[in-house]
């Protein structure tokens, strides 16, 4: 479990980051990352995982993901819906190629950033659900 968790997390981040180019996105990548949390839960006990994961941190992560998504949605509405604000900046100065399958990471405008916000929300939400189910199954109650 200790050797696989890094690969699962990196693959989940890859799925989140490239969701606008390939099948995937924030929800799918978040679910992949939470499958790593489930693997840790199976390999170790729920009490061990409860020591390292706090409910408050998961709540803050989930709320932050929703807030970031809403802010980016309104920022995109300010100019053109999902306007690619990265074009013309010193780092990404060239105009990206258009058309399906261009393969350039920065052609998605706000969509990759919104995928990260959705991924953050899904990771926190599903982790909370999985940990609550594990603690309930072990006979321990949550401290809410």
Predicted regions and their residues:
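Cytoplasmic juxtamembrane regions at transmembrane-helix boundaries
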Residues: 130-144
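Short, non-helical or kinked segments that cap or interrupt transmembrane helices
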Residues: 20-34
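Hydrophobic alpha-helical transmembrane segments
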Residues: 102-127
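Interfacial and helix-entry/exit segments of alpha-helical transmembrane bundles
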Residues: 1-8, 49-74
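A cytosolic-side transmembrane-helix exit/cap motif
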Residues: 43-56, 107-111
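Juxtamembrane non-transmembrane "cap" segments at the membrane-aqueous interface
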Residues: 71-98
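Alpha-helical transmembrane segments and their membrane-interface exit regions
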Residues: 33-42
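Short, hydrophobic/aliphatic alpha-helical segments
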Residues: 2-21
